[in-house]
């Protein structure tokens, strides 16, 4: 979407008029000498007129100052009058500045957020080449039996996923030290009582120091500690390392504030574990529910977004694990020119599938300073090849809500009949209303979904 800046410039022009110019102040009703005489004073034009038996100055008339509007096609027809014409203003646009759709960081955490333009300063690079140093560790109670190369193969597909999600804008490059380093304590000792930030950082620091004599961390952007996948004592939570306020680790003169450590659940999630955790280090939040609402519902953790986005509870085999358009926009993988921020009462737009590059990727309707309705198009392709229903996906983003508590909610929501949100995308003729905004699909084909938005 091209946007042009319209600048108004006041232009001072010198004109030659067939009248005299007064050197002193002129007042309406004051006596003048010659009928028809014209005088200019304080940007007002006065004419000497007959009033009864007297000649007096008429009421002053403002002299128009010409204004030139600079536009892409400045072709205006001058008025036949002495005053240069102004260009006719364009109709009020239906698409507004993106400012209102770029939701702020407003959840009070400080390390990750669904909002943020600009992004949180200590989060990882998201464009170009990112070097991820991989250190492999095992434990006295769980010595590795697989080779380092076999362990690396568990996470290496994540590189291609990042390339797909970013439309080739991010090259996340694993740089492994293919050697097992033995940690000083049993695996369960590190996670006993649960991870805290300090315990997690100490674990990473110990692993890095074990390898320091053989590894140059000078170019490290992201640090991965890959634990022996057979170490059950590491539990089922391999968290991201997202330091803030200078609390990261300095290695070989390089400050490192982003990374991740694996756990036993790597065997279940496989390399999408790395995509999920590293995307935290890029600043994004958990979309799955971190609290329990209904213990009888086995899909309770999916109650906000179902199986959309791998920032929820999505594996490679899930319905549609590709990142949402809003997430990709926040990371700079979708350009501003591919987003429409709409405040008009009615708007129609073709949205191209998020799975392919090019075209409009999202239509966003701001609701408040922290909340917006987003519409995107999804198709069964690439990482989303298992998607059961294509169409326009509608969701509400609220940057005042913290990670895991529902910062994104997909609609329509039917937790009884569709707890995985498999039927959520709107097909041709289907609609949904969110926050007073109605979205209806009026055309759908391989090129995407044309939606009509009204409120």
PLM region spans:
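Polybasic, low-complexity, intrinsically disordered segments
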Residues: 2, 6-95
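Sequence contexts marking disulfide-bonded cysteines in secreted/extracellular proteins
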Residues: 31-33, 47-49, 100-105, 340-342
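Extracytoplasmic
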Residues: 43, 129-131, 370, 389
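A mature extracytoplasmic/lumenal domain signature
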Residues: 52, 61, 138, 229, ...
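Zn2+-dependent metallopeptidase catalytic core
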Residues: 93-269, 273-275, 431, 440-443
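Non-catalytic C-terminal accessory/binding modules of secreted extracellular proteins
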Residues: 102-107, 113, 145-146, 240-264, ...
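A short, structural micro-pattern
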Residues: 128, 303-305, 388
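Extracellular hydrolytic enzyme modules, especially secreted metalloproteases
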Residues: 217, 222-224, 230-384
């Amino acid at each position: 979407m091209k946007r042009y800046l319209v600048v108004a410039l006041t232009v001072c022009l010198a004109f030659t008029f067939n009248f005299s110019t007064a050197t002193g102040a002129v007042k309406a009703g004051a006596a003048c000498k010659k009928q028809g005489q014209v005088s200019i004073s304080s940007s007002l034009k006065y004419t000497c007129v007959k009033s009864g038996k007297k000649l007096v100055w008429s009421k002053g008339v403002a002299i128009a100052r010409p204004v030139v509007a600079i536009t892409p096609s400045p072709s205006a027809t001058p008025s036949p009058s002495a005053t240069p014409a102004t260009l006719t203003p364009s109709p009020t646009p239906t698409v507004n500045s993106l400012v209102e759709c770029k939701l702020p960081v407003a959840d009070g955490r400080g390390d990750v957020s669904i909002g943020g333009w600009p992004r949180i300063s200590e989060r990882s690079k998201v464009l170009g080449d990112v070097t991820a140093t991989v250190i492999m560790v095992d434990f006295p109670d769980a010595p590795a039996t697989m080779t380092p190369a076999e362990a690396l193969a568990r996470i290496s597909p994540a590189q291609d996923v990042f390339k797909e999600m970013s439309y080739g804008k991010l090259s996340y490059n694993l740089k492994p030290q293919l050697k097992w380093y033995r940690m000083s304590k049993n695996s369960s000792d590190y996670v006993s009582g649960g991870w805290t930030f300090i315990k997690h950082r100490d674990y990473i620091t110990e692993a890095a120091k074990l390898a320091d004599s053989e590894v140059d961390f000078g170019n490290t952007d992201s640090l991965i500690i890959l634990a022996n996948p057979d170490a059950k004592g590491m539990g089922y939570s391999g968290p991201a390392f997202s330091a803030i306020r200078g609390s990261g680790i300095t290695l070989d003169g390089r400050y490192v504030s982003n990374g991740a450590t694996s756990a036993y659940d790597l065997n279940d999630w496989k390399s999408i574990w790395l995509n999920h955790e590293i995307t935290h280090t890029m600043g994004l939040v958990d979309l799955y529910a971190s609290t329990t609402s209904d213990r009888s519902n086995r899909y309770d953790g999916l109650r906000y977004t179902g199986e959309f986005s791998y920032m929820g509870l999505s594996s490679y085999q899930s319905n549609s694990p590709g990142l949402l358009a809003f997430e990709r926009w926040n990371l700079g993988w979708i350009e501003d020119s591919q987003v429409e921020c709409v405040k008009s009462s009615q708007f129609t737009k073709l949205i191209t599938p998020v799975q392919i590059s090019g075209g409009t990727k999202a239509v966003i309707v701001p609701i408040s300073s922290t909340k917006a309705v987003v519409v995107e198009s999804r198709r069964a392709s690439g990482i989303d090849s298992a998607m059961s229903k294509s169409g326009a996906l509608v969701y509400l983003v609220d940057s005042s809500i913290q990670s895991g508590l529902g910062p994104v909610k997909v609609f329509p929501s039917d937790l009884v009949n569709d707890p995985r949100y498999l039927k959520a995308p709107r097909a041709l003729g289907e609609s949904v209303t969110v926050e007073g905004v109605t979205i209806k699909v009026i055309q759908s084909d391989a090129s995407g979904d044309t939606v009509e938005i009204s409120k």
